[in-house]
């Protein structure tokens, strides 16, 4: 009989049970309060990751990932390293996020600040009091992780927020942070605790001004459902009157 051995030595006869155990052991943070939860560089290596049911925690995923799902999190600071696909965040309140991803979607969230790199326009649904600012993450391995996630740090649509629940495009559910409101040092102490002094040393790789044509669109909102695919969203843009985002030609096939 074939046995499946998990990374901690636990053995399973059933392959599905082994896979579930491995994911929940190594790629999940769940049911924690007042804890610091860290995955360092090289510990995720492009795998999906789940975060759920946290309160008053600090979470740092300092590696490139596949899809990340975040559910039912309150009063927490969360750093999500480069995701090659999507980050889905639901039912979160009073949180601060630093996120790098290809696609970002919020649903049923309230009073959150988001320091963002997103290769596509971020989407919010049934969410309120959301604040957005440019990505503020800096550490030595970050540039390599952007490459591994196939993300161009110079193409950042952090400000192009689409609000599904604002048909009149009033912008009452979200706003852009003024630069003087940003906390540029929010991760400095946590990174110093999680990484070596050498690994903390780095230059900024995501420029502040890297939206299409250097313009920040404050009123260019569109409406999409939480399940709208990126292809459907892009087709809506092509059929509408709003200016289209300009993507680097090297990424047209992504």
Predicted regions and their residues:
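Charge-rich, low-hydrophobicity low-complexity segments
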Residues: 1-81, 128-254
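Extracellular beta-strand scaffolds
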Residues: 45-46, 56-57, 64-68, 75, ...
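Short C-terminal domain-edge/linker segments immediately following a structured domain
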Residues: 90-91, 109-111, 120, 127-130, ...
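Ankyrin-repeat TPLH-centered helix-turn motif and closely related helix/turn capping elements
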Residues: 100, 111-122, 128, 133, ...
